[in-house]
Amino acid sequence: MVEKRKISDVIFGKQTETKRSTGYNFFRDDPAESVFGSQFIQGYNTSAGNWNVSGLGNGESNSAVTACLQLLGLSFSEATLDVCAINSDGQKEIIPNHPLALLLRRPNPFMSGDVVQQYLINGMHVSGNAYLLKQKNEAGQLVALYPLMPEDVTPKGTKEELITHYEYETGGEKLYIDQKDIAHFKLGLDPKNYKKGYSPLKTVLREIFGDESAGQMATALLSNMGVPSVMITPKDEFGPTPEEAEQISKSYQQKVSGKNKGKPLVMSGAMNIEKLAFSPKDLDIGLLRQVPEERISAVLGVPAILAGLGAGLKHATYSNARELREFFTENKLIPLWRMVGEEITQQILLKDYEDSTLYQAEYDFSDVRALQ
């Protein structure tokens, strides 16, 4: 049972009638087990090995991913959104202080326009989707836009129409939100479900998992002051009792780890000490983390140098960093500005403000520093 509510009901918690969603979906809502919902992950579209990622989530908590998303979000916010109209000469004219442009500077009482724009970019790249809920007054005028958590929103459709409404899960209940009351921003299309966008991060979850594992390994070694695991065995045929073995183990740990690292260890009896684990030098953990950084930055379209990732810093100079920022702006940000501007035009401007296609919302990036 899906509860049908007005937007004011969703925001302010009023109760209304319920309505059951009916109809056949144009595309199935629950395709073969999602890569994000699975306990294991394989290489994208392959069957090459399984990795347990039950605690990894969608990858956004990874530090390399966060560095790239921060750069994307902050850089995207540098451009300003204008509402334009095409005049009789076919030229675009900016409409000063258009209500939509003013709204997007402060979409709701709690968030600035920059914060909401960063949400859009992060949501599109992490989950493939970002959603803005429209709040309207009694006269039907748009007065606020609220971002929704992408993982809590499910687009629904019928056999005849791709998307008819959205289900928003909050507080253990599912709310029905009409399609016209949400602006849905997609990054491409999910090849298994055209109602949703496509997340580039899902193709590198394996690498993200590897990066997290390498970090955990480095932390474990460092917490032991860089001393790898060892096996202690007696040289003579008479071994220690279980109690003696436990005491030897505790004594070894106390003498060679933590603040006691480097102190001499004196043991009774002849003993062999064999190293079982690799040292940080043997593992070359820095190299293990380089490949994930390279692939994460590649699928997100962010040069590693600009994100401050180690994979790019060793080749960084002031000159090539400046060239890469221009490359990043022209090949990543400008297409994003055009994509988001078109969605704002179609889903907000023409639905809630203007009824003529002569109007459009577009980002002005003429003052973006990287293009000067």
Question: Model features per residue range: what roles?
Answer:
Residues 2-285, 289-291, 295-302:
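Structured, contiguous alpha/beta core segments that scaffold functional sites
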Residues 225-243, 263-372:
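Surface-exposed loop-to-helix/strand elements on domain peripheries
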